[in-house]
Amino acid sequence: MELGLFTCGYQRYPLEQAFEDAGRFGYDYIELWGGYPHAYVEDLSLTGVREVERLVQKYHIPVKCFTPEHNAYPFNYMTGDAFQWVRSMNYLEKAIELTAAMGASKMLFSAGHAGYRMSVQEIDERLQKSLERLVQKAEQQSVTLILEPLTVYESNVITGLNDLERALDKVDSPNLDRKSVV
């Protein structure tokens, strides 16, 4: 079994501190949080990817998973109008590309709250459409997606293993991880 350090808790430190601590405490890899100031998708230019690569080389700790910050406005693909959905999809597709560019093999994401006006059928259709599009991009980039359940306070879409299993059954792809759900 390998243990990874999730960098979200380091958002008030330089990213290098997370790598340094991961090495010092014996972690096997980094799960890179895609939030400001370290690796926010829209700011993670080629220079940002190079900085992550420099830290990987310096500390000999790979980034195995990228977790882009999303689900809050404007990047929640489960709510809003068509423009917000497209914007959210573009954002997550860029995150998949950055995952591959950093040499990470996995990207963790979740389904945000769908609001209180959508029917169960509308939620299911939007989720399936979203997963199909993201999986297609992941297949092109050789990235495995991990879909994370959220709490009932964060989402009304996937909040437990039964919801997760139904979601995973909607899209058949080796790039949508079914093993990391427990």
Please report, for each region that a protein language model flagged, where it lies by residue.
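Conserved beta-strand positions in the central sheet of alpha/beta enzyme cores
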Residues: 31, 65-67, 108, 146, ...
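Glycine-rich tight-turn/loop motif centered on a GG-T
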Residues: 78-85, 116-124
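Residues at alpha-helix caps and immediate loop-helix transition turns in enzyme cores, especially N-
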Residues: 14-18, 44-48, 119, 123-126, ...
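Substrate-binding cleft and catalytic face of glycoside hydrolase catalytic domains
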Residues: 64-74, 108-114, 152-156
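Acidic/histidine-rich catalytic cores of soluble enzymes
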Residues: 29, 36, 125-182
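Active-site groove signature of glycoside hydrolases
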Residues: 99-120, 141-151
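Glycine/Thr-rich phosphate-binding loops of Rossmann-like dinucleotide-binding domains
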Residues: 40, 117, 155
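N-terminal pre-domain/capping segments
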Residues: 1-104, 132, 139, 173
